[in-house]
């Protein structure tokens, strides 16, 4: 048993309470490798922003659970090295699909876990979540759950259609499960193709897809039912078109990739939404930078020469999200 407290990590309880009260959101950045982790810590330390390091089941398998533990501990020490005296860093399991996986993560030093029973019948989702909560809370690990289903494909999470969260269910669900935060569905979705062309309009000047607005009416109803309760948005990458253009320019094929407009995320961050998940954007930043290096320097084969620029581009992206979108800068001095 490894306690996250021994690794220098924190859980989400206090940071979420501050975020809801302060009208900003905590960035939850998914990572798979060292360069992504370095970029996240560099940006967070520079901006003094609390941050959630998210690891999916697939990323955990890719990076290895033992290495992840030491990467997280190293991230805390690296943040201090960069001058962040009191780093507020969470290690979070994203989309845990079983009690066994959540338990394993708690036992290996995660400070927060998500149990995703959203595809289960309502009562089964409650029972599974409650079981995870009871185990995690014994070790002061916080638990996120999802009510409603997001469409799209990202990592090992896939669904054909989204189903909005039903506001009338949230009080019963949160009360009976004891979860610490609730991921809801209001129109976000996973992956770089968050909307089908038929769901969008098309800008006549640029030819780009314009996505439909999020269902803020559903969010506001949920806020009324659960005032002050921490709400989470998944699938909230904006799919920056400059990265899509670079990828396509240098041999990629991402036609009509479209994400969540940042002005809608800014609006969400001012509400009870205190955690916003971002994964695809960093993948796009990394891929765009690597493709550009390979195209401009076809003889290059030193990984540092293409992963270094990728890391730098991701850092710029993370800083932009922290400062210009979520408003979490300066909240973890």
PLM region descriptions:
Residues 258-259, 273:
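A C-terminal functional module that forms or caps the active site or interfaces directly
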Residues 235-238, 258, 278-282:
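Short acidic/histidine-rich active-site segments
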Residues 10-21, 34-59, 65-86, 95-230, ...:
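Alpha/beta enzyme core
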Residues 26-30, 91-92, 114, 231-233, ...:
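Short catalytic-loop micro-motif centered on adjacent basic/acidic residues
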Residues 3, 24-32, 59, 305, ...:
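A short N-terminal beta->alpha junction/helix N-cap motif
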Residues 53, 60-64, 265, 274-298, ...:
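Shared catalytic-loop signature of beta/alpha-barrel
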Residues 1-27, 300-301:
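Generic N-terminal amphipathic, Lys/Arg-enriched alpha-helix
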Residues 289-333:
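Extended, intrinsically disordered, low-complexity segments
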């Amino acid at each position: 048993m490894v306690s996250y407290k021994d690794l220098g990590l924190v859980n989400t309880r206090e940071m979420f309470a501050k975020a809801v009260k302060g009208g900003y959101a905590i960035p939850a950045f998914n990572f798979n490798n060292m360069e992504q982790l370095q970029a996240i810590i560099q940006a967070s330390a520079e901006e003094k922003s609390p941050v959630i390091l998210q690891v999916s089941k697939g990323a955990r398998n890719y990076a290895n659970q033992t290495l992840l533990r030491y990467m997280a501990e190293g991230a805390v020490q690296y943040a201090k090295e960069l001058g962040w005296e009191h780093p507020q860093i969470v290690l979070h399991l994203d989309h845990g699909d079983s009690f066994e996986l959540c338990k394993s993560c708690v036992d290996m030093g995660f400070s927060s876990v998500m149990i995703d029973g959203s595809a289960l019948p309502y009562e089964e989702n409650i029972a599974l979540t409650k079981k995870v909560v009871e185990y995690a809370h014994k070790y002061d690990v916080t638990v996120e759950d999802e009510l409603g289903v997001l469409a799209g494909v990202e990592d090992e999470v896939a669904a054909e259609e989204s189903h909005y969260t039903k506001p009338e269910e949230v009080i019963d669900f949160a009360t009976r499960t004891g979860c610490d935060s609730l991921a809801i569905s209001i129109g976000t979705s996973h992956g770089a193709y968050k909307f089908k062309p038929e769901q969008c309009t098309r800008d006549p000047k640029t030819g780009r897809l314009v996505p439909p607005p999020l269902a803020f009416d559903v969010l506001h109803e949920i806020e009324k039912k659960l005032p002050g309760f921490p709400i989470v948005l998944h699938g909230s990458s904006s799919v920056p078109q400059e990265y899509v253009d670079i990828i396509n320019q240098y041999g990629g094929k991402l036609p009509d990739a479209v994400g969540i407009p940042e002005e809608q995320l800014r609006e969400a961050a001012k509400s009870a939404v205190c955690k916003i998940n971002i994964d695809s954007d960093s993948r796009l930043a990394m891929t765009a930078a690597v493709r550009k290096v390979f195209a401009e320097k076809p003889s290059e084969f030193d990984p540092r020469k293409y992963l270094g620029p990728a890391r730098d581009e991701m850092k710029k992206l993370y800083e932009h999200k922290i400062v210009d979108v979520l408003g979490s800068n300066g909240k973890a001095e």
